[in-house]
Amino acid sequence: MTRALTKLEFSLYSLLHLKFGGREFSLDSARWYFSRPMLKKLVFKLSEAGWLKTKKRGVYACETPEKAVSGFFEPKAENALKKSNLSYCFTDASAAEIWSDQSYIQRSWEYSPFFIKVFRKDIKKWRAFLKQNGINFFEKEPANVVGEFIRLKPAEKMEIDEHNGFPVEPLHETIKFCEENKDTFEYVLAYIQNKYGKKTTASEEFLLKAREAI
């Protein structure tokens, strides 16, 4: 997983890539305008961020820009959530995906939100955990965001069901969400009505389409 660089880190990466390309280099050959302590610190951060490869002690090589940038879009949120040791459940559009058995998917590699409900008392723990794991997260609706991220939705209490191995809000809550956002989630409503026998306002056209997926 690649993380974004500071201006100074990116300047050093650019210099290293222009000078060495994919060739190996040592710290001594890259001292130019930086003191040795500062250079060691920056090189460590570049390596930790996924922009440099450590070949052996004190010897590095630049990761290609293409590979480094593609690292921004590597999926890791779901696996991290499983290791959080904190209570949560998928909600809203993420719950719609789960209850529809992924026949409806609202995510893509370039825009991949996960909506999770968490206990309000745990919000500081969630912030620390997600920062530690390098996962982008928001507590309000984000704007101008790409890639994978988690939208935290704090709650005083929550009911957690399980479906296909995922902790998810109860089906009736997902139906309510989909009804309130019917223009986007009518297919999910139709799937739910066909699969679980729950009455919804899905049209016959969508009911027929969803029936084919079950």
Question: Could you describe each region identified by the protein language model?
Answer:
Residues 1-90:
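Short beta-edge/loop segments at beta->alpha junctions of small alpha/beta modules
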Residues 66, 120, 156:
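A broadly conserved detector of short glycine/acidic/proline-rich loop/turn motifs that flank catalytic sites
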Residues 32, 36, 116, 165:
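Short, charged/polar micro-motifs that form catalytic or ligand-binding hotspots
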Residues 55-56, 118-121, 178-183:
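Short, flexible beta-strand-to-coil junctions
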